[in-house]
């Protein structure tokens, strides 16, 4: 591409078509900015803005209160000993895997682990053993499966895995496994546990200490109303000196964080939304109630909710055999659902999906959820003769 | 910290004190957002905004034109075969080091390399050999030093280093080494070269192919008028399959990028500013002229510019013996300069520095640079009897 005026025209400011829609994509519902975060974004948008206030260590900046946020508020919020801000949950996971494991070591992942957990382990050179789930319809994860997996690794490789990970909840079905029991099983074998809380931290109460997780990863752009990429990482006292070890070349810089991570608008939007995020987490029971109400309405229409029931998270997976039937017959084929939802200003079911899809009810409230449910009902009706 | 209403009050939206000042911090001058980027920031601020348009691979998104940007515009701009967007220049460097080197391998760095190059190499488990510079006043980097360093590594470790890196320009003196000659020296030994262009890409013309660099790293928040953390990485055809290798667990995700990198406002501000960035790079001769004019005015006042002369970059290092003298005598001590500049609405010389400091003239234009130079002159005058 020659970079002339004509080709450059396609870049510059670009509108975001989905901005005004009701978005039920699980990736988006917890990442919508608060008003304070929108203001922070404009205020701190320039490149390295927070570095104007930095004496050499990002998380030691006193004003703006990054120090208080990272070293006082975050450990309290995650209920862990030490915390840092990272470039995302996957970067948090990689930092843990890369510092706790050595290439050739093993890691145990739950069978519903996010692809980024696999990729992070692969990047760290770790071999992967998965704990199977029970499959459809519950996708239940038996904590005892961790014992079996750890024993298998030990038998095959001569030593226990370096690390275990559990996804809490998983990103497909929104299942909340018994993380506390899993931590206890792992600890019986002296295997530390990393809790991937990308869909938990910032949405629902979660305590690393109560669970017994040695590490906890959260996502700012997924669940903490922040502009990404930004994440959080909590580590126990025992492992903090390893994960947050300092460079031998530069005494104040932490190796796994490459010195500095979120250094600008991202950390400032995380801080801006934090008071609201703390408050919304306290409102989690209402979110669960909304999710259950929504699931019940969907089931009344003949959709089948997969995963835990009654459900305890806003992320839900549905099977919609009737939509699949329709897609086989209508002109627009498998794109009919996406288009009919778009016409109703609803976004978030991936284009082309009909038989199976996931969605999230988080933060939408009963009124908007009602509009979504009514819209699905209308679409069913529209095609009732098909 | 108990997360109650009183403690949460310190978070939320926070003002940025330096927003209206003339900022000469080298970290800031190339990262100021364009108007288009400010608009993009607000439009695309929410968490995972671009993922609404993603079919599974970030850099394949057609609308917004991330695909065209990453696969057509960026390779042209960097003059390399393949490019990607990353979470920053240091993350670009780590991705290269981690995929090209194995723990225990060696890397050759120039003696003026940024700390993040050291930390990235350390994180990748690489041993570091540095190419010495000539020291004060020029800090000249002899390309032949790379031959010596490579030979030393080969002698000591039994094999050549996995990689060499050159900082172009360095972040202390703004020196532009003879990167083309360095590439040619490295290639004589079959050692690939990574060009750290965090202060070049987006400010001045730079061509990976003309230089002969196998890899080129750039920074969005440092030099491409983008809201960070965001960076770019260019790789030659030969090494692209290694650095951008796909996961064995997920066929579309690239391991070194952990699947996805800049997935939201950061990539959209990079794209928003891109047309202006392409244009400002064409204006580089004027920037160099401004830097030289500024340097001359500073030298007239008795400050001494260190590093290359005549200078060919906006980042400059000054020695100011007179300011040091003043700082020894005045009440405010070494903070007098910071405070006197602040009173004149100028920011960017680190608080407490007087004898040595660096600054950048980039993008400020003659008028603002005149104000800065006049202000330094006034401050000298203010203390002339001290």
Swiss-Prot record, chains A, B:
EC number of this enzyme: 2.5.1.73
GO process terms (BP): translation
Reactions accelerated catalytically: O-phospho-L-seryl-tRNA(Cys) + hydrogen sulfide + H(+) = L-cysteinyl-tRNA(Cys) + phosphate
Species of origin: Methanosarcina barkeri (strain Fusaro / DSM 804)
A Pfam entry, by short name: SepSecS
Similarity remark: Belongs to the SepCysS family.
InterPro entries for this protein: PyrdxlP-dep_Trfase, PyrdxlP-dep_Trfase_major, PyrdxlP-dep_Trfase_small, Sep_Cys-tRNA_synth_arc, SepSecS/SepCysS
HAMAP family: Sep_Cys_tRNA_synth
Presence of keyword Protein biosynthesis: yes
UniProt-recorded Gene Ontology molecular function terms: Sep-tRNA:Cys-tRNA synthase activity
Quaternary structure and interacting proteins, as annotated: Homodimer. Interacts with SepRS.
Residues bound to pyridoxal 5'-phosphate: 89-90, 196, 219-221
Name recorded for this polypeptide: O-phospho-L-seryl-tRNA:Cys-tRNA synthase
């Amino acid at each position: 591409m020659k970079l002339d005026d004509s080709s450059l025209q396609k870049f510059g400011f670009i509108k975001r078509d989905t901005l005004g829609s009701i978005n039920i994509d699980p990736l988006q519902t917890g990442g919508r900015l608060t008003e304070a975060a929108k203001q922070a974004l404009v205020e701190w948008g320039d490149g390295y803005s927070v570095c104007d206030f930095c004496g050499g260590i990002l998380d030691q900046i006193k004003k703006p209160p990054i120090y208080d946020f990272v070293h006082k508020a975050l450990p309290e919020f995650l209920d862990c000993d030490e915390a840092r801000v990272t470039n995302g949950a996957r970067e948090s996971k990689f930092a843990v895997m890369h510092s706790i494991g050595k290439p050739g070591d093993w890691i145990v992942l739950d069978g519903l682990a996010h692809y980024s957990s696999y990729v992070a382990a692969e990047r760290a050179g770790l071999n992967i053993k998965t704990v199977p789930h029970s499959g459809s319809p519950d996708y239940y994860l038996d904590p005892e499966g961790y014992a079996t997996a750890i024993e298998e690794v030990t038998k095959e490789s001569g030593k226990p895995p370096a690390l275990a990970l559990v996804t809490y909840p998983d990103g497909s079905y929104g299942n909340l496994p018994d993380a506390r029991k899993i931590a206890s099983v792992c600890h019986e074998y002296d295997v530390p546990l990393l809790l991937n809380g990308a869909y938990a931290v910032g949405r629902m109460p979660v305590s690393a200490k109560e669970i017994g997780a040695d590490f906890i990863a959260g996502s700012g752009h997924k669940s903490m109303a922040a502009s990404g990429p930004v994440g959080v990482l909590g580590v126990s006292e025992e492992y903090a000196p390893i994960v947050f070890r300092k460079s031998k070349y530069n005494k104040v810089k932490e190796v796994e964080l490459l010195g500095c991570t979120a250094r600008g608008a991202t950390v400032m939007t995380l801080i801006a939304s934090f008071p609201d995020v703390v408050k919304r987490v306290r409102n989690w029971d209402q979110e669960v109630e909304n999710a259950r109400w929504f699931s019940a309405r969907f089931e009344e229409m003949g959709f089948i909710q997969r995963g835990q029931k009654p459900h305890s998270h806003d992320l839900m997976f549905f099977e919609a055999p009737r939509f699949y039937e329709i897609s086989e017959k209508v002109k627009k084929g498998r794109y009919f659902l996406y288009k009919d939802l778009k016409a109703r200003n609803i976004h978030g079911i991936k284009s082309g999906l009909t038989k199976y899809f996931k969605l999230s009810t988080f933060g939408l409230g009963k009124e908007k959820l009602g509009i979504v449910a009514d819209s699905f009902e209308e679409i069913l009706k529209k095609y009732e003769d098909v």
